[in-house]
């Protein structure tokens, strides 16, 4: 029953203001804080009752089928309880020095490793508006990047201002330089802009793309969205 609505760009900038701000000790605390604060702020602005509800990034809506991505391990879920919350995340400009290579003598990793993270966030180089996304990384080789260093590296894009394609290309190039893999595929699925998907993919071969994300290159296949999209 509001006579007004919130202008879209201002709403994006408003929710961006929660970035880099400690809202609680646990994910549940953070979501409740944002729910309560945003509900209060927007209700006051529009002079009506508005309810805001945040959901975990990895939730899949009923009926959604994220094609070929159930084989990926989500980085945020890989660590032991408490390990992620105690991790020092202090670099917010892209830094390849964060990446650490490990030789997997213990056999923890398979020859082909697939990582997913919903923590990718950068900013538009023209408007500075926030761009949130999911990154999917698949590579085959004898060297591996440590999960902790990869997560820190993904987070390091948060203050960068680049187009989606540049972010994807940078991640691909950095990993290719340090791992020298036989196959590498990096896919960045971003929150839609004006209803338009901008989902760059960079890979060592068309074969790698066909394996990891066939729905993105087949014009006869409907691309399945992520929860963010």
Question: Residues of each region from the PLM?
Answer:
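N-terminal intrinsically disordered, cationic/polar leader segments
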Residues: 1-229
